[in-house]
């Protein structure tokens, strides 16, 4: 005897890039523009910063040092 269970509709799996963009939009909506900053991105926002003491690192961070009032994470080799 066959099961007459309804078949769920097929949905297109979300692309990782789409998921990331959606999450980033939600974070910016909740916490404000500039809440997520990528290393090396130039920002048009005026953000007060504390120098790291390294001109190269300050330039790489993008705002001239560690941004004040924000949680930062730097990782890598």
From Swiss-Prot:
Gene Ontology CC terms: cytosol
Q: Name one Pfam family in it.
A: RecA
Q: Which GO terms describe its molecular function?
A: ATP binding; ATP-dependent DNA damage sensor activity; single-stranded DNA binding
Enumerate the UniProt keywords alphabetically. Answer: ATP-binding, Cytoplasm, DNA damage, DNA recombination, DNA repair, DNA-binding, Nucleotide-binding, SOS response
Question: What PROSITE patterns does its record include?
Answer: RECA_2
Q: Where in the cell is it found?
A: Cytoplasm
Keyword DNA-binding: yes or no? yes
GO BP annotation list: DNA recombination; DNA repair; SOS response
Which family does the record claim for this protein? Belongs to the RecA family.
State the function annotated in the UniProt record: Can catalyze the hydrolysis of ATP in the presence of single-stranded DNA, the ATP-dependent uptake of single-stranded DNA by duplex DNA, and the ATP-dependent hybridization of homologous single-stranded DNAs. It interacts with LexA causing its activation and leading to its autocatalytic cleavage.
Q: Name it.
A: Protein RecA
**What is the native source organism of this protein?**
Spiroplasma melliferum
- From which lineage does this chain's organism come? Bacteria, Bacillati, Mycoplasmatota, Mollicutes, Entomoplasmatales
């Amino acid at each position: 005897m066959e099961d007459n269970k309804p078949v769920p509709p097929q949905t297109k799996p979300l692309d990782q890039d789409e998921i990331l963009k959606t999450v980033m939009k939600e974070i910016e909506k909740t916490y404000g523009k500039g809440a997520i900053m990528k290393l090396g991105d130039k920002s048009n926002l005026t953000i007060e910063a504390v120098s790291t003491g390294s001109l190269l690192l300050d330039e790489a961070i993008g705002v001239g040092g560690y941004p004040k009032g924000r949680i930062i994470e730097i990782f890598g080799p």
